[in-house]
Amino acid sequence: MASTSSTSTDGHLNIRPMVHGSDKKLNFGAYITGLDLNNASDAEVDQLREAILRHKIVVIKGQQAEKPDKNWEMIKKLDPMHHMITQEEFGQLFHPTGEGLIAMLKLATVPTTEHGHIHLMGKGYQGDDHYGLKKLNLGEAFAGNYYSKPLAEEDFRAGVTRFQSWHMDGPLYKVHPPYISSLRFIQLPDGEQTVEWADGSGLSLKTKPGRTAFFSTSQLYDMLTDEERAMVDNSAVEYMYYPYEWIRGCRGNPNGLNVADEGREKPLDAMEEIARDERWTKTYPMVWFNELTKEKSLQVQPNCVRRLLIRRSADQKEPEIIEGPERVREFMNKLQQRIVRPEYVYVGPEEEGDHVFWYNWGMMHSKIDYPIAYGPRIVHQGWIPSHRVPRGPTAVAH
């Protein structure tokens, strides 16, 4: 739904849709003031959930004093159908023994009473005592070599950067993706960077460092042709089991969309050796409904897809099967590439103390790396899997 410049107050919440510049065509986002996340009432939680589904992403201002326990409590309340898991189970969503991606990332967990999944997504020194984490320095890993077209370190130091990887939160195996996701921005670096697409398009975008990029998958759906909408409405995707283990050796495309076709996936015979339960492999509609607004979103994370089940219309009984990483990614790139442009991308938030919640079933987001010379980044990330099953025009989700 398009944002306007009007201001509305729902109960105690002041909800102000974002007003984007004349160079922007994106149609989502809102700011919220008048909400204390440490003391939110049940009515305010309900209003916040509705605002997130309606505006896709909300930035709650002035949350410098928010407590990690209250952060985790809010994440659970925003999805009453959440799926509780332990920290050990969290790692096992990505690899049966907790190895692989999660072990490689070495995520620091912010202590909470319930051992919630509030992870420290920062850079540099996190302080002498950050909620019980003592003198933690997250260092500076340079991600330039992750791309199939590497980013030169001297360019990176000079302020050039890239989108890292467009994705929705969740493992895409065993459990359903989180309904709503959370980033609390505690400390942010200063300066300016230029995100370069580096894909031959010549596109670029000025940003502040340490922020996160977002685009709307409902806006993407609206950009499709009638023929394309008829196809995606009736099609589905099957994700690889433990998909992040499958693509762990892959390099990313320089614009952050998908991974490069270089044959670097873990071989299928090696994947077959990984213990798994076929019941946990996820097949979802390409298009997901927003239960509040009834909007449709083209909600596909292409780098993790094993095969596509394509029906051009509701009358087509048997799907056309598209499989093989190169064919799948080429097909999805043609559908998704059009939204990855500066005018459709929001990068935020603006300042420290902002807490961002977004509708994970209707957005894609990407980290943007920066040099530590700009200063430390202290951010709390949180999400919880959902028992909700994504629904769309094609009822295939499991």
Swiss-Prot record:
One of its GO terms (molecular function) is dioxygenase activity. Fe cation binds at residues 167, 169, 365. Keywords: Dioxygenase, Iron, Metal-binding, Oxidoreductase. Pathway: Mycotoxin biosynthesis. Binds 1 Fe(2+) ion per subunit. 2-oxoglutarate binds at residues 212, 377. Its EC number is 1.14.11.-. Alpha-ketoglutarate dependent dioxygenase; part of the gene cluster that mediates the biosynthesis of the diterpene glucoside brassicicene C. In the first step of the brassicicene C biosynthesis, the bifunctional diterpene synthase bsc8 that possesses both prenyl transferase and terpene cyclase activity, converts isopentenyl diphosphate and dimethylallyl diphosphate into geranylgeranyl diphosphate (GGDP) that is further converted into fusicocca-2,10(14)-diene, the first precursor for brassicicene C. Belongs to the TfdA dioxygenase family. This is Alpha-ketoglutarate-dependent dioxygenase bsc9. It comes from Alternaria brassicicola.
